[in-house]
C-alpha cells in the first residue's frame, strides 16, 4: 500500500478531519444537496484527487493509477456480475418461467402468514442473492399486495425481511468486493464471510419471528410456531455453513432455496389449525404441473450450479499461476505508476452467471437468443449509471487507501480503543443510509475498519463483518430502498410514512448488532 504520509499536519485530529472530507462531501451531496448519485460520486472523486495529491502528497501518477484501478474493478468483476444477474432475472420473466415460479410459491399454503414467510422472507432472500439492487423488495412487495396485503404494510415487511439477506446481495458482491480493496492485514472476502457466521445468525433467526409478530402479533407466532422454527433454523444454519465452507457468492441463494423446499415439505404434513386470511380473502394461484414448476426454477438451479463450480478450489486452481486457464487473466501496470490492474475473464463470477443465462435461453422455447440479447442491451443501458457510480466510489476508496487518508481515519477512530467495536456497525449503518448500498459502504469504510482493528488489536475481519451487518440494518430506512419500495406498491409520496414504520426496527437491530459485536470483540 503506497502511503506518502497519513499525518501531513503533524496533528492527527486535523489530518483525520481533512481525510474525512471526501466521505462527508459524498454524504452531504446525497442528503443535503439532493444531488444524483453519479454527480455526487464524480464531484467527490475530483475533490479526493486534489486532497490526496496536494495535502497527502500522493504523486500524480499514483493518483491516476488509483483511479484507473478503481474504475476497472468497478466494471470487472462488480459491474459484470450486476449486469449478468439482472439479465438472468429478465430472461426468467420474459420466458414466462418467473410467473410459474411465483405461482408455485403462492400455492403451497392459503394461510397468509405462511405466504409471508415464503414470499416476504424466503423468496426475498433468493432474489437478493440472484439479483439484488432493489429487485427483491420491489417484486416481493408487489406479490404481497396482490395477495391482499396493504401496500405500505407489504413494503415494510419486505424491507425488514431483507435484513436477513442484504449482506450477500447479487451473488455476494457486498462481501466479495473486499478482495478488490487490498485491506490492512490481507483481509479477504472469505475471512469476512466466515466471520459473518458469528455476526449475522441471531439476526437471521429473529427476523421471521418479527415478521409474523408484526402481521398477527403473538397469536400468529403461537399458531404457526412450527413453520417459523423451520424457516428460521434452516435458513440460519445453512447460511452459516455456506459462509464458512463455500463463501459469500451463494450465501443467500442456497439457504433460501433449501428453506423454501423444506418448508414446503413440512407443510404437506402440517398446516395451521386456523387459516389466516387478510380481510377474509385469499388469493388462488394458477395450477402448474410439477414438470412446469421444475422448468420454471431451472434458470436458478443453473445459476447455483455454475456459481458453485466457480467457487471450488479445483476450478480456482486452473486459474492460478501455472494452471491451464492462467492465460485468461490479464494484468498491466498503469503507466507512470506502480499500481497494477488485473482482469480475470473466465474466473469472474459473472462468467458463471453468463453460462446460466445462455444455457437457459438455448433450452427454452419461449424466448429466442435475439430477444435475450435485446434484454441484455436494455440491462446495460439501465444499469450504466449505477455502475459508473460504483466505479467512481471505488476510485475514491483507492485514492484514500493509497494516499494515506484511510490510515489517518483509522488512526483517529482507533483512539476510542476497546470501545470501537461497538461503534463499528454504526459506521456501516451511516454508510448504507447515505449511499443506499452495502457495496459502496464496504468500499468506503472497510479500509477504515481494518486499519482501526490492526491498531487496537481487534480482529479486522470481525470489524468488516460488523460494518456489513450494521449496513444491512440501514437498508430498512435508506432513502434508496424506501423509494424503490413505495414506487413498487404505488405509494410514491408516502416515503416519510414508510420510513417512520421501519425506523424503530432498524435502530433496534442496529443496537443489537453493536452490542453483539462488542461481545465478540472480547472473544476474538
UniProtKB/Swiss-Prot annotation:
GO terms for molecular function: lactate transmembrane transporter activity; solute:proton symporter activity. Its main location: membrane. It holds the Pfam family Lactate_perm. It comes from the Bacteria. It is a multi-pass membrane protein. The chain crosses the membrane at residues 12-34, 38-60, 67-89, 127-149, 156-178, 193-215, 224-246, 250-267, 297-319, 339-361, 374-396, 411-433, 505-522. GO terms for cellular component: plasma membrane. It is found in: Cell membrane. Keywords: Cell membrane, Membrane, Transmembrane, Transmembrane helix, Transport. May play a role in L-lactate transport. Belongs to the lactate permease family. This is L-lactate permease. It comes from Halalkalibacterium halodurans (strain ATCC BAA-125 / DSM 18197 / FERM 7344 / JCM 9153 / C-125).
Amino acid at each position: 500500500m503506497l502511503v506518502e504520509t497519513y499525518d501531513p499536519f503533524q496533528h492527527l485530529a486535523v489530518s483525520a478531519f481533512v481525510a474525512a472530507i471526501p466521505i462527508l462531501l459524498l454524504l452531504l451531496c446525497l442528503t443535503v444537496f439532493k444531488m444524483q448519485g453519479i454527480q455526487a460520486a464524480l464531484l467527490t472523486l475530483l475533490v479526493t484527487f486534489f486532497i490526496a495529491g496536494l495535502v497527502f502528497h500522493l504523486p500524480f501518477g499514483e493518483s491516476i493509477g488509483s483511479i484507473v484501478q478503481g474504475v476497472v474493478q468497478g466494471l470487472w468483476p462488480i459491474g459484470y456480475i450486476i449486469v449478468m444477474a439482472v439479465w438472468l432475472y429478465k430472461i426468467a420473466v420474459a420466458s414466462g418461467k418467473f410467473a410459474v415460479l411465483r405461482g408455485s410459491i403462492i400455492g403451497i399454503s392459503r394461510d397468509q402468514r405462511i405466504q409471508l414467510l415464503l414470499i416476504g422472507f424466503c423468496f426475498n432472500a433468493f432474489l437478493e442473492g440472484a439479483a439484488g439492487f432493489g429487485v427483491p423488495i420491489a417484486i416481493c412487495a408487489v406479490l404481497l399486495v396482490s395477495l391482499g396485503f396493504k401496500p405500505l404494510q407489504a413494503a415494510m415487511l419486505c424491507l425488514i425481511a431483507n435484513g436477513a439477506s442484504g449482506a450477500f446481495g447479487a451473488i455476494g458482491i457486498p462481501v466479495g468486493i473486499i478482495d478488490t480493496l487490498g485491506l490492512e492485514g490481507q483481509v479477504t472476502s472469505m475471512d469476512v464471510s466466515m466471520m459473518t457466521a458469528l455476526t449475522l445468525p441471531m439476526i437471521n433467526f429473529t427476523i421471521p419471528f418479527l415478521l409474523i409478530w408484526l402481521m398477527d402479533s403473538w397469536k400468529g407466532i403461537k399458531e404457526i410456531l412450527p413453520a417459523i422454527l423451520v424457516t428460521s433454523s434452516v435458513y440460519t444454519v445453512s447460511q452459516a455453513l455456506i459462509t464458512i465452507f463455500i463463501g459469500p457468492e451463494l450465501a443467500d441463494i442456497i439457504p433460501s432455496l433449501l428453506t423454501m423446499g423444506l418448508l414446503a415439505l413440512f407443510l404437506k404434513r402440517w398446516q395451521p389449525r386456523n387459516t389466516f386470511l387478510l380481510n377474509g380473502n385469499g388469493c388462488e394461484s394458477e395450477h402448474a404441473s410439477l414438470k412446469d414448476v421444475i422448468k420454471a426454477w431451472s434458470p436458478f438451479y443453473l445459476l447455483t450450479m455454475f456459481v458453485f463450480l466457480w467457487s471450488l478450489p479445483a476450478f480456482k486452481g486452473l486459474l492460478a499461476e501455472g494452471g491451464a486457464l492462467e492465460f485468461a487473466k490479464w494484468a498491466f501496470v498503469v503507466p507512470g505508476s506502480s499500481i497494477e490492474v488485473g482482469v480475470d475473464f473466465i474466473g469472474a463470477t459473472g462468467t458463471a452467471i453468463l453460462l446460466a443465462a445462455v444455457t437457459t435461453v438455448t433450452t427454452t422455447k419461449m424466448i429466442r437468443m435475439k430477444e435475450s440479447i435485446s434484454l441484455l442491451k436494455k440491462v446495460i443501458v439501465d444499469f450504466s449509471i449505477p455502475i459508473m457510480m460504483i466505479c467512481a466510489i471505488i476510485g475514491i476508496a483507492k485514492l484514500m487507501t493509497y494516499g494515506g487518508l484511510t490510515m489517518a481515519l483509522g488512526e483517529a477512530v482507533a483512539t476510542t480503543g476497546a470501545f470501537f467495536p461497538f461503534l463499528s456497525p454504526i459506521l456501516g449503518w451511516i454508510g448504507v443510509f447515505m449511499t443506499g448500498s452495502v457495496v459502496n459502504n464496504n468500499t468506503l469504510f472497510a479500509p477504515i475498519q481494518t486499519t482501526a482493528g490492526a491498531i487496537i488489536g481487534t480482529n479486522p475481519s470481525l470489524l468488516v463483518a460488523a460494518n456489513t451487518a450494521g449496513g444491512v440494518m440501514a437498508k430498512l430506512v435508506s432513502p434508496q430502498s424506501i423509494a424503490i419500495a413505495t414506487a413498487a406498491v404505488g405509494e410514491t409520496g408516502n416515503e416519510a410514512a414508510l420510513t417512520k414504520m421501519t425506523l424503530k426496527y432498524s435502530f433496534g437491530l442496529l443496537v443489537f448488532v453493536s452490542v453483539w459485536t462488542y461481545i465478540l470483540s472480547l472473544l476474538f
